[in-house]
């Protein structure tokens, strides 16, 4: 599935920019024995958000997925590892989560529409300095008010002491993997079309 690269890379890049030498707060998402793990908030429980949460959970992070679909939240609650919690998404619930969150993955996608801004500039002050926002929805306008597209050459910028990673083509950082993933996903359709 081509999005595999996207969701895995979003967590990997977020974890990298949480490192102190990269400008982050110096948090290891998985923690170590005797030290609490990092906290990840995933906005959107669709394919990308679900799998980003799985990736973060696999690293040992404390993960929360926020979504507006109760049936989707029920499904996620039943299928996710124990270190993943679900939360109904609203401005109020997001504001409650931000003070203890290290990494926010914005994975909100509304097909054919611009992504909603779920985190405003005013809300940035709720995060601790050195926290990281990764906007996977940047191709649809971004789901953070302060998002603007970045490149692999200059992937992050800082606003109000919060790092923003808004690379428009996240899989482009790992072209060998992403090309093979896309080929594997599309090849069956090409073969089927040739047989027709």
Residue ranges and their predicted role:
Residues 2-6:
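Short, small-residue-biased leader/transition segments that mark boundaries at the very start
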Residues 47-53, 71-73, 112-118, 141-144:
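Short glycine/serine/threonine-rich phosphate/pyrophosphate-binding segments
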Residues 8-26, 184-193:
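A charged, well-structured terminal subsegment
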Residues 95, 99-100, 113-133:
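Rossmann-fold NAD(P) dinucleotide-binding segment
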Residues 23-106:
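Glycine-rich phosphate/diphosphate-binding loop of Rossmann-like nucleotide-binding domains
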Residues 122-165:
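Rossmann-fold NAD(P)-binding glycine/threonine-rich loop
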Residues 108-112, 137-138, 168-169:
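Short glycine-/small-residue-rich Rossmann-like dinucleotide-binding loops
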Residues 32, 40, 178-195:
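Glycine-rich phosphate/adenylate-binding loop
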């Amino acid at each position: 599935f081509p999005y595999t690269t996207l969701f895995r890379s979003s967590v990997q890049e977020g974890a990298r920019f949480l490192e102190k030498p990269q400008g982050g707060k110096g948090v290891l998402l998985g923690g170590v024995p005797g030290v609490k793990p990092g906290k990840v908030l995933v906005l959107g429980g669709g394919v990308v958000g679900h799998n980003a949460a799985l990736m973060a959970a696999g690293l040992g992070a404390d993960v929360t997925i926020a979504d507006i679909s109760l049936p989707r939240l029920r499904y996620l609650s039943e299928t996710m590892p124990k270190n993943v919690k679900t939360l109904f998404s609203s401005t109020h619930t997001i504001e409650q989560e931000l003070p203890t969150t290290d990494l926010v993955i914005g994975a909100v996608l509304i097909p054919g529409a611009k992504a909603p801004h779920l985190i405003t500039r005013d809300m940035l002050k709720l995060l601790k300095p050195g926290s990281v926002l990764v906007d996977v929805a940047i191709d649809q306008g971004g789901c953070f008010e302060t998002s603007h597209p970045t490149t692999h050459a200059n992937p992050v910028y800082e606003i109000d002491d919060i790092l923003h990673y808004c690379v428009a083509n996240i899989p482009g950082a790992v072209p060998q993997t992403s090309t093979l993933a896309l080929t594997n996903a599309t090849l069956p359709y090409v073969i089927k079309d040739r047989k027709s």
